[in-house]
């Protein structure tokens, strides 16, 4: 036979704590847009899905917490310390290595880790050297600088030319630019009855309608009442 305490615990309204399946609770269910829902990969995170679809999670720059892009690999020379080398030569190598590392801008590299000329500003160049310091290739910048006097629409068109769009983005743009019929707001049943009472009592005298405290409870102005009465007349074919 159970003790008094156990019987009280069994009758208590407080439920026993149980584990829950967090993955099922936090699973994203895309319902807003059919194109995004069709191409959404539930095995990836939100940021990874947006990057794959060609969208942006945030319009500005991230302050941190971004996933490292492992496709861009920068080869670094292994530093070999020799007991017979001079201190001055070592310092020169260290400073030169630091300068080379600082000069590399990750935003100017492509997926293969090579310089992309379309990402380098026009009038600048980037030099690629081999292990001995000899020049292998020179990348000349082709990205044009932004003109301050340029029109906003013209600037937007220029950015759209340089921007590489995914198939999902193209479908979304076509979906957004489709012609949509404008749906006008109709009168509700109660609003129709209220306008009918106003018209039967005051006719076309909108000033009296405005000062009618019993019918015009929300103190709608003469112009608002006029527009609503004209709409009501058109609906009921009243001249």
Curated annotation (Swiss-Prot):
Subcellular location as annotated: Nucleus, Nucleolus
Acidic residues bias spans: 85-115
Superkingdom, taxonomy of origin: Eukaryota
This protein's GO CC annotations: nucleolus; ribonucleoprotein complex
Biased composition (Basic residues): 1-23
PANTHER family hit by this protein: HSPC111 PROTEIN-RELATED (PTHR13243), NUCLEOLAR PROTEIN 16 (PTHR13243:SF1)
Homology family: Belongs to the NOP16 family.
Subunit structure: Component of the pre-66S ribosomal particle.
Protein name per its UniProtKB record: Nucleolar protein 16
